[in-house]
């Protein structure tokens, strides 16, 4: 059984005996316990279980105790460490020197003991040794007897822990390519060096003929298929057929295609994570799957010119429910765009919520909207907006039909209600695919995302000579007047899901205008997640040594390892590039 990755908590202490160390033991260990309690009571793994912490077997005052802690952490699947102390300790003697996991140090801001002095000293040692560490120091002085964690310290501890857990959850998993390069899209030219060196992941690949082989040979659960077919007939609405008359398929052929795409979903899922039921049916090899945390399906053109497209499979894999009930989502990229798949994965691991995969299709200026519709944009939309749309791989949770405190949200599966599932299905239909583009047919997904949701759009790009770079745009979904929506939506493919998105502007750089956001976006796709998580993404990127080339996160929310400041404090973007380039990938 694979263990969850854990956070290791290291209480370090002044090693001087005969009074000094003894007087600090309880306070120091209590700091460790309070951090562990904070993390375990606040954060959850993607399966909904509380995050686990491991505390060192004793306080750490000298090298043998640091070594004992290191050994315990190795056995306990610790993916990151947090060192805590209220006092002076011996810097390089007590530090954790593991170079391939993130580290953070919280130095208590008090006057009785110099916790801040240790923090500065050990961070200097980390910088000298080339092992980055995040420094955490409360803004306000606390009393020595104060056991509470200040709010600013909590925020940094949790931001660090979320990002660190993401690195641990990715390590030793796989990206599964189903097919190869789709229509020459750069993101579907899968780069194994990137996955191995930056994420600690491996790459697996199957030809798309694996789908037809499993269908032809019955390598799927026939009982589940019958249950799925019944559920789809009762719950999934087939949408309007927009095809011209000579391309409309017969009712009999559409019914066959529904059966086909349901099997595609089952096979795609089984390829990713396996299915013990297949072993019972005599298919032991296929039952184990590919240990894939994220996958992509090429589809176009070789598959979709002949077979039904992958939209239904992609949509329901990314969605938090199916005929088996409510469950955690899979992370699945259309067109095998591995870089957008990784963008979705970053978002998912930081939020435990499903993702919208979309083309960054169109920038609508206020002037263009006025000319086409007669409508004057206002509010969040006043500066214009982006049309996000793609036929597949867009979670049904993207409808915004789930709610929290009366507002539309996308939330973890363990919070999802059956009534919200039904609302998502009611507000979605599945039109027959546009056969001018998808000659083999299939079914696309059509819905409109509710407005006023805070969201973050993300894209990872590969730059020759530099490596991966990340771009982040926080903003809000929009709800346009119905007639305006239909006028704009019908100018593209009305059979696809639409999200109207207004990025938050800052007045500088790539965020001077919505046009500049569109113009600086690095690829044709984006990964959209619920919430403003740009600060968490920046922290995660720094752990992986991926520079951020574009973001609209307030400077006070940026949290990177302390040695980033030694690369410069005025131009943070350039300092980020230099730090990442010098330190190199986390797993190299």
Swiss-Prot record:
Subcellular location: Cytoplasm
Matching HAMAP family: Fucose_iso
UniProt keyword Repeat present: no
Keyword Manganese: yes
Single Gene Ontology MF annotation: L-fucose isomerase activity
Cellular component terms (Gene Ontology): cytoplasm
Protein name: L-fucose isomerase
Main location group: cytoplasm
Pathway: Carbohydrate degradation; L-fucose degradation; L-lactaldehyde and glycerone phosphate from L-fucose: step 1/3
Residues annotated for Mn(2+) binding in this entry: 335, 359, 525
Catalytic reaction equation(s): L-fucose = L-fuculose
PANTHER family per the UniProt record, alphabetical: L-FUCOSE ISOMERASE
Family the entry assigns: Belongs to the L-fucose isomerase family.
InterPro entries with a match to the protein in the record: Fuc/Ara_isomerase_C, Fuc_iso_dom3_sf, Fuc_isomerase_C, Fucose_iso_dom1_sf, Fucose_iso_N1, Fucose_isomerase, Fucose_isomerase_dom2_sf, Fucose_isomerase_N/cen_sf
Entry keywords, A to Z: Carbohydrate metabolism, Cytoplasm, Fucose metabolism, Isomerase, Manganese, Metal-binding
A Pfam family this chain is assigned to: Fucose_iso_N1
Annotated EC: 5.3.1.25
Cofactor: Mn(2+)
Active site: 335 (proton acceptor), 359 (proton acceptor)
Gene3D superfamilies tied to this protein: 3.40.50.1070, L-fucose Isomerase, Chain A, domain 2 (3.40.275.10), L-fucose/L-arabinose isomerase, C-terminal (3.20.14.10)
Broadest EC class assigned to this enzyme: isomerase
A biological process from GO: L-fucose catabolic process
UniProt cross-references to NCBIfam families, sorted A to Z: fucI, PRK10991.1
Function: Converts the aldose L-fucose into the corresponding ketose L-fuculose.
């Amino acid at each position: 059984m694979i263990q969850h990755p854990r956070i290791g908590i290291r209480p370090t202490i002044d090693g001087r005996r005969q009074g000094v160390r003894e007087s600090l033991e309880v306070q120091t260990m209590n700091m460790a316990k309070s951090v562990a309690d904070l993390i375990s009571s606040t954060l959850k793994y993607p399966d909904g279980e509380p995050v686990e912490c491991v505390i060192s077997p004793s306080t750490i005052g000298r090298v043998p105790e640091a070594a004992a802690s290191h050994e315990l952490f190795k056995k306990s699947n610790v993916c990151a460490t947090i060192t805590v102390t209220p006092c002076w300790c011996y810097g390089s003697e007590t530090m954790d020197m593991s170079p391939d996991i993130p580290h953070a140090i919280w130095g208590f801001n008090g006057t009785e003991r110099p916790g801040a002095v240790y923090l500065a000293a050990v961070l200097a040692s980390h910088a000298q040794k080339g092992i980055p560490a995040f420094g955490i120091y409360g803004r306000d002085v606390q009393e020595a007897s104060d056991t509470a964690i200040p709010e600013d310290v909590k925020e940094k501890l949790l931001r660090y822990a979320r990002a660190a857990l993401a690195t641990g959850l990715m390590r030793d998993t796989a990206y599964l390519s189903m097919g190869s390069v789709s229509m020459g899209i750069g993101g579907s030219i899968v780069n194994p060096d990137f996955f191995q060196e930056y994420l600690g992941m491996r790459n697996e690949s199957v030809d798309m003929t694996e789908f037809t082989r499993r269908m032809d040979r019955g390598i799927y659960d026939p009982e589940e298929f019958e249950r799925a077919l019944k559920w789809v007939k009762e719950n999934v609405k087939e949408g309007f057929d927009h095809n011209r008359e000579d391309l409309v398929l017969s009712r009999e052929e559409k019914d066959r295609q529904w059966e086909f795409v349901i099997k595609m979903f089952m096979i795609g899922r089984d390829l990713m994570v396996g299915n013990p039921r297949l072993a019972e049916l005599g298919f032991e090899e296929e039952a184990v799957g590919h240990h894939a945390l994220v996958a992509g399906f090429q589809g176009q053109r070789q598959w979709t010119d002949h077979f039904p497209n992958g939209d239904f499979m992609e949509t329901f894999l990314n969605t938090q429910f199916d005929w088996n009930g409510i469950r955690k989502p899979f992370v699945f990229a259309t067109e095998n765009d591995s870089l957008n798949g990784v963008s979705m994965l970053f978002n998912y691991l930081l939020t435990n919520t499903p993702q919208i995969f979309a083309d960054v299709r169109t920038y609508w200026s206020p002037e263009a909207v006025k000319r086409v519709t007669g409508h004057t944009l206002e509010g969040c939309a006043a500066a214009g907006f982006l049309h996000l749309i793609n036929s597949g791989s867009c979670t049904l949770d993207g409808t915004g039909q789930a709610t929290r405190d009366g507002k539309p949200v996308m939330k973890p599966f363990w919070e999802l209600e059956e009534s919200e599932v039904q609302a998502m299905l009611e507000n979605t239909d599945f039109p027959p695919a546009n056969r001018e583009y998808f000659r083999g047919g299939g079914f696309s997904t059509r819905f409109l995302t509710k407005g006023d949701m805070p969201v973050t759009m993300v894209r990872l790009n590969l730059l020759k000579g530099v490596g991966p770079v990340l771009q982040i745009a926080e903003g809000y979904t929009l709800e346009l007047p119905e007639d305006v929506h239909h006028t704009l939506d019908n100018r593209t493919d009305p059979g696809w899901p639409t999200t109207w998105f207004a990025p938050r502007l800052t007045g500088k750089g790539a965020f001077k205008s919505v046009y500049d956001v569109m113009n600086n976006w690095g690829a044709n796709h984006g990964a959209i997640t619920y919430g403003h998580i740009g600060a968490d993404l920046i922290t995660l990127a720094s752990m992986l040594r991926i520079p951020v080339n574009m973001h609209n996160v307030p400077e006070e929310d940026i949290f990177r390892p302390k040695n980033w400041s030694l690369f410069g404090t005025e131009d943070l973007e350039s300092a980020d590039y230099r730090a990442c380039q010098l330190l190199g990938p986390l797993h190299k």
